[in-house]
């Protein structure tokens, strides 16, 4: 869920263009193309399907027509008027999910009407989500609804305003099954006190107040910087979660503390202030806060991105004043994280975070005044340790019979002949049989993002889906394609839907549109 459809949803983030927007548009194009089940609707299935196919939209056309915060996004954003939202709300999210900011923003806006829970999870319900530990979501939800829908006297209104799982140095792995950490509660949520980190003359990140810095540094990250960032929208605890950050640091400007003498625990949204100079109209800035383990392994604790044309707000973006030093303040995503003694805190700045965000059309880079860097980290403050009940059933999902195996592939390829970097995703659900109704389905997604590290206009995104649905004596399928290209002035998007009854094509439709870039 989100309280802010523009900044905390799958489309845009602080004025940057999320690649997840095209991915989700391609996903929805494929999902909408699926046929009705012949066993449920009978002989009218084909007429219903053709009507559905004829009428289905390509959502990217509408989303890309609203690149700034306008009424289209305000309409579904309760942050526009929290006072007009009278309903008590229990808001739940996970640190590994793109919607991690929602619980904190909700309780800050709703006050006593809001309660928040943030676990370690991806974008799944907490009773079957990864990474573990899980939470008994059913018990939490039922108690909440009984209190507010059935007037049950169960004390739900007395719940702590914030319950959060503090991540305790999880290591990047091929699959994040379990994240170390512990649950805390804060009875009342207040704006956290902060610890201020600055850059010393020797380049170290420190909390002493010394901010001599190392001078002005020009930063223009290779445009393929960011391939260890995982997905904005996480559905699996594998490479969709950010991996070891060292591979992205080569294209970044980094500063780190010495080994910590004592633990440092944070809960909330960090804030970075920095003076930058831009020789172009605008540029993107990505910021990562990293936990450096004693052996050098690096875990991303949180990150944030900003299109500098949106530095003063998302409704009326403006060009940067060329050649003039400009003070930028940006809020990063929320985190709940413990840096252990002996670990280091690293700050990484880059002008690219691909493929998570798409590059600006000029990609001019930025000159960073390192003496101006101020990183405000939100301290955990007063709290109590708590336990959170886990679900009684550790494996609640139905078990599907597999007629063909599932497969996932994800890779980064640097082509030394063309100079392109490819980020490729292949997912095949396998042919599975629904345990209750016997419907057989298979979904295959093939996604390819590519870019020349020196040319922002070389960016391409290609997404293909193949969906197969069958019963004995009945087989239908759809193939969808979704693409994005760009010029200095336009986004170029295209899509197609083709439907088959057996091997025979019975429907085809295509979309293509050129949409002007709007400070993006």
Label the model's feature ranges.
Residues 131-500, 504-520:
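C-terminal, loop-rich substrate-recognition/catalytic regions characterized by aromatic stacking residues
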Residues 101-115:
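Active-site-adjacent alpha-helix of alpha/beta-hydrolase-fold enzymes
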Residues 85, 91-93:
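Short beta-strand/loop motif that positions the catalytic acidic residue
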Residues 83-85, 110-111:
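Short, conserved loop/helix-junction motifs that constitute active-site signature segments
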Residues 95-99:
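Acidic catalytic loop of the alpha/beta-hydrolase fold
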């Amino acid at each position: 869920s989100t309280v802010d459809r523009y900044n905390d949803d799958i489309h845009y983030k602080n004025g940057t263009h999320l690649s997840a927007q095209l991915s989700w548009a391609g996903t929805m194009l494929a999902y909408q193309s699926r046929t009705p089940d012949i066993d449920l609707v009978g002989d009218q299935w084909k007429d219903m399907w053709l009507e559905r196919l004829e009428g289905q939209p390509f959502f990217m056309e509408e989303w890309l027509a609203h690149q700034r915060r306008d009424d289209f996004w305000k309409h579904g954003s309760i942050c526009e008027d929290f006072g007009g939202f009278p309903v008590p709300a229990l808001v739940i999210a996970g640190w590994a999910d793109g919607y991690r900011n929602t619980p904190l923003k909700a309780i800050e806006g709703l006050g006593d009407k809001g309660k928040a829970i943030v676990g370690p999870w991806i974008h799944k319900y907490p009773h079957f989500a990864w990474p573990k530990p899980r939470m008994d979501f059913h018990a939490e939800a039922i108690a909440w609804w009984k209190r507010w829908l059935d007037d049950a006297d169960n004390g739900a209104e007395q719940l702590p305003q914030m319950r959060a799982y503090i991540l305790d140095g999880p290591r990047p792995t091929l699959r994040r099954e379990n994240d170390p950490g512990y649950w805390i509660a804060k009875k009342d949520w207040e704006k956290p006190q902060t610890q201020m980190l600055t850059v010393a003359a020797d380049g170290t990140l420190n909390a002493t107040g010394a901010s001599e810095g190392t001078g002005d540094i020009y930063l223009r990250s290779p445009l393929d910087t960011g391939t260890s960032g995982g997905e904005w929208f996480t559905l699996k605890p594998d490479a969709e979660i950010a991996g070891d950050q060292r591979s992205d640091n080569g294209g970044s400007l980094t500063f780190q503390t010495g080994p910590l003498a004592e633990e440092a625990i944070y809960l909330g949204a960090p804030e970075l202030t920095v003076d930058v100079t831009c020789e172009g109209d605008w540029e993107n800035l990505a910021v990562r806060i990293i936990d450096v383990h004693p052996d050098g392994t690096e875990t991303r604790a949180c990150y944030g991105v900003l299109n500098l044309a949106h530095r003063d707000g998302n409704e009326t973006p403006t060009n940067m004043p060329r050649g003039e030093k400009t003070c930028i303040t940006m809020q990063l995503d929320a985190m709940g994280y413990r840096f252990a003694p002996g670990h280091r805190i690293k700050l990484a700045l880059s002008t690219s975070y691909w493929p998570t965000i798409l590059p600006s059309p000029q990609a001019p880079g930025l000159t960073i005044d390192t003496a101006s860097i101020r990183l405000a980290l939100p301290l955990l403050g007063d709290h109590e340790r708590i336990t959170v009940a886990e679900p009684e059933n550790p494996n609640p999902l139905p078990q599907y019979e597999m007629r063909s195996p599932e497969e996932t592939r994800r890779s980064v390829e640097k082509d030394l002949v063309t100079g392109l970097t490819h980020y490729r995703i292949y997912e095949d659900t396998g042919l599975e049989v629904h345990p209750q109704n016997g419907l057989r389905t298979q979904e295959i997604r093939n996604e390819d993002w590519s870019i020349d590290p020196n040319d922002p206009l070389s960016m391409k995104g290609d997404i293909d889906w193949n969906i197969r649905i069958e019963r004995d004596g009945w087989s239908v399928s759809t193939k969808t394609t979704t693409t994005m290209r760009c010029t200095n002035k336009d986004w170029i998007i295209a899509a197609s839907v083709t439907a088959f009854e057996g091997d025979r094509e019975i429907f085809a439709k295509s979309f293509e549109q050129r949409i002007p870039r709007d400070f993006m």
